[in-house]
Design a protein with these regions (language model features):
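Amphipathic terminal alpha-helices
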Residues: 288-293, 300-319
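Mid/C-terminal beta-alpha module of Rossmann-like enzyme folds, strongest
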Residues: 208-271, 306-310, 317
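N-terminal Rossmann NAD(P)H-binding glycine-rich loop of SDR-like oxidoreductase domains
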Residues: 3-23
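Conserved C-terminal active-site "lid" loop/helix of NAD(P)H-dependent oxidoreductases
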Residues: 195, 255-298
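Active-site Tyr-X1-5-Lys
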Residues: 128-152
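Substrate-positioning beta->alpha
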Residues: 164-170, 184-207, 215-216
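NAD(P)H-binding glycine-rich loop region in Rossmannoid oxidoreductase-like domains
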Residues: 44-85, 96, 115-118
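Conserved Rossmann-fold NAD(P)-dependent oxidoreductase catalytic core, especially the SDR/UDP-sugar
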Residues: 89-129
Length: 319
């Protein structure tokens, strides 16, 4: 199977290219940023260049990952053109390329605000411009019936593991240095996704029979939610750091308000505020049974993921 992966220089993209090559697929990576996993340097906003790239590759399948994924835009959707016009461009490019049999279109869990459980696939409750842009991604794909090919939508949750962004690296270094604290003592359940597991899930979505995926929407995450406290404690153990202390929720809220005040006077890098506290305390779990039924058992458990991530971070630090 020949697969075109857009966004092949990104976190998930690089892992997916490696997985597909390990499964003996013929993989072509496309991204606007050069990388070892990228064969074609092309911006998906360049409609003509994209159409030529897809037609020239003549893939059997397309996995669309290319997107702007930050939450920085606060004014309007114009900053997220890659998630709107870029998707429309790729839909048209796929439509014009007869070799393509299947396409997987990547959306996001943030088409709904964290903590909201949608009643159906088109029950949207985005509370960020990024999330709204991913709603448009889904609407474009649905309205075009996936460019007339076999298709499904994927909604990744929070993805972690080797290759993760500097933001998450800083978080883990806080644990390593003994600067992190738990809020309260109860479990905080999160549907997180380990990077090798989500790459495996994408491969399975490419491989299974049509009737198992066509016109469906899949949340992509580990099937068993992670308790944030247990997850952080696992990192602490592998780092060999001091045990993570537990701070009462009331004390944490007071500290967060102090952080808000510090941020308000211009010190944006203060490490704790109400936004981050809410991120910690908000639990979210998704029904992964449909995904598990299609994709099957995952290759890695949490402990394996933590061990691999710590080894990767130490290798980075040694360079």
């Amino acid at each position: 199977m020949k697969v075109l992966v857009t966004g092949s220089s990104g976190f998930i993209g690089q892992a997916l290219v490696r997985r597909l090559r390990a499964e003996h697929c013929d993989v072509v990576g496309l991204d606007k940023v050069p990388a070892e996993t990228t064969d074609i340097v092309c911006d998906i906003l360049d409609a003509n260049g994209l159409t030529k790239a897809v037609a020239g590759t003549a893939p059997d399948a397309v996995v669309h990952l290319a997107a702007r994924i930050d939450l920085d835009e606060k004014t309007d959707l114009s900053g997220y053109t890659a998630n709107i016009e870029g998707v429309a461009n790729l839909v048209e490019a796929v439509r014009r390329t007869p070799s393509v049999r299947r396409a997987i279109w990547t959306s996001s869990q943030l088409v709904c605000r964290i903590g909201y459980v949608p009643a159906n696939d088109t029950d949207y409750k985005a509370d960020t411009l990024y999330g709204q842009s991913k709603v448009r991604t889904e609407e474009i794909v649905r309205s075009a019936d996936g460019a007339g090919r076999e298709w499904c939508l994927a909604r990744p949750t929070t993805v972690w593991g080797p290759g993760m962004s500097a933001h998450y690296q800083r978080f883990l270094h806080m644990i390593e240095r003994g600067h992190y604290f738990h809020v309260g003592h109860g479990p905080l359940w999160k549907s997180y996704s380990y990077i090798e597991n989500i790459a495996f899930q994408y491969w399975r979505l490419l491989s299974v029979p049509t009737d198992q995926i066509h016109r469906r929407t899949f949340y992509l995450a580990d099937y068993t939610p992670i308790d944030l406290i247990a997850w952080c404690d696992a990192f602490q153990s592998y780092f060999g750091s001091r045990p993570i202390p537990h701070l009462p929720a009331g004390v944490a809220r007071t500290l967060a308000l102090c952080g808000d005040a510090v941020n308000a006077i211009g010190l944006k890098r203060f490490p704790f505020n109400s936004f981050r506290l809410n991120n910690v305390l908000t639990q979210y779990q998704f029904d992964l049974a449909p995904t598990a039924a299609v994709c099957g058992p995952l290759p890695c458990d949490m402990q394996q993921g933590v061990a691999a991530t710590v080894a990767w971070l130490r290798n980075l630090s040694a360079r």
